[in-house]
From Swiss-Prot:
Disulfide bonds: none annotated. It comes from the Eukaryota. GO terms for biological process: mitochondrial genome maintenance. It comes from Lachancea thermotolerans (strain ATCC 56472 / CBS 6340 / NRRL Y-8284). InterPro entries: Gep5. Belongs to the GEP5 family. Keywords: Mitochondrion. Its main location: mitochondrion. This is Genetic interactor of prohibitin 5, mitochondrial.
Length: 267
């Protein structure tokens, strides 16, 4: 038995969580688990336990939504076609608040999704093979930005509980109006897609339907190890770990059906 599995014996968590973690740990290491388990052993902090529960169901044992899997698979191609807007073009608009993609994103307008376009940046002359058709790429982008808009409109679901930045690339001008260097523009594309990926896949991932059901069962009827006596305390621990929970399912018309989890009503 490895050290990580032995560490489970000291964690006062629901039996089903401990069994799930044991199965995972027997197959591979889980990033951050050992440190959190050691921290709990050292100071008995409920924060460490809360983090273990959250990471178990939202990361270590969670399944990515299909569009997130495709995002990872086609990352480079999506970066090459990532939506952008020149600050210079905003200056020439009659009504920027309704015409500018940046302004629409800033106001979390649902109209922004229909205004987006995904042409390759004009000054990117490097030829790279495309694995997606234009239609497939458009659908993929729509789902990514539908997901992002959902979170941007609900900062209480985000990891930082703060508002998210605009997800498109904004290409500024120099103080005297000249274009910025192309190398800087390329870096803007790299940073922006990395930011959106981090928000959707790492910081605030959707909870799989299976894990939502598992957590609901635990909160409704905790199963305690022999050395844990308080069901109420364990229940509250799991409730706190579910903050920010939401689910995503495919919808035949809407693309994605994204909802705040029913677990939030139990907080």
């Amino acid at each position: 038995m490895n050290m990580a599995v032995r560490a489970l014996e000291k964690l006062p968590l629901d039996i089903r969580t401990l069994e799930l973690l044991e199965r995972k740990l027997l197959k591979k290491s889980l990033p951050g688990f050992q440190e959190l388990a050691q921290q709990y052993t050292a100071d008995g902090s409920s924060k460490s336990l809360e983090s273990i529960v959250h990471l178990t169901y939202f990361h270590w044992c969670n399944e990515d939504a299909p569009h997130i899997k495709k995002f990872r698979e086609h990352y480079a191609e999506l970066r090459d076609h990532w939506p952008y807007e020149f600050h210079r073009s905003i200056l020439s608009m009659d009504t920027p608040k309704t015409q500018s993609i940046r302004f629409l994103w800033s106001s979390n307008s649902p109209k922004v999704l229909s205004k987006m376009s995904y042409e390759k940046y004009a000054h990117d002359t490097e030829e790279r093979p495309s694995r997606l058709t234009e239609l497939q790429r458009t659908v993929q982008f729509h789902e990514v930005f539908q997901h992002f808009l959902f979170l941007k409109s609900r900062p209480h679901l985000c990891k930082t509980r703060k508002g998210l930045a605009v997800p498109i690339v904004e290409i500024p001008m120099k103080p005297l109006g000249q274009n910025i260097p192309e190398v800087r523009v390329r870096n803007l594309f790299k940073r922006k897609i990395a930011y959106v990926w981090k928000v959707l896949a790492l910081d605030s991932p959707a909870l799989s339907r299976q894990n939502e059901l598992s957590l609901a069962k635990i909160i409704d009827s905790p199963q305690l190890p022999e050395d844990v006596s308080s069901k109420r305390e364990l229940k509250r621990l799991y409730q706190r770990a579910c903050r920010g929970a939401y689910t995503i399912e495919q919808h035949p018309v809407l693309g994605l059906e994204i909802k705040e989890s029913k677990l939030l009503k139990r907080l």
